[in-house]
Amino acid sequence: DLRSEKSLAWVAEQNERTIRELFPSSSPIENEPLHAELLEVFDDKNRVPTVSVRGDFLYNFWQDEDHVKGIWRRTTWEEYKKKDPKWETVLDIDALAEREGKSWVYKGARFLCYGAGEYRRADGWVRSLSEGGTDACEVREFDAMEKKWVTENPFYIPNSKHTVCWVD
């Protein structure tokens, strides 16, 4: 049981052990220089977004103080080249979690490759979501062009540990 008292105590013990190894002083972790440096890097709003190019868009998963669970967003090449590109939200994980009453953690996406000559298609994706950040995920088919979950005969894998690939 992942949420049992015994399991949570084990996790807390391993976290403490790791913190002692990384930050050997007795001061709180927040006072450690490495902690501050890492936070500065991860929270920098000017960091260059890593993108996946599909069709006419560049896609990026982004987290910040306004999007704690994250948003999946897109922009065009022209916008991406600008100092402050405009992004369009495609999927908001925070809003999804609130709407569904689940503590969703985004675990990635797979673009559905349609085969030779179809490289510009960007509509089909499967998204992996984990409740509470566990190793198990559910996989749902998402239409990026419509910005919504596929409801008619969708690809779906219920919560489990698995690997997914697309074969047409």
Question: Language model features by range: what are they?
Answer:
Residues 1-168:
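Beta-propeller folds
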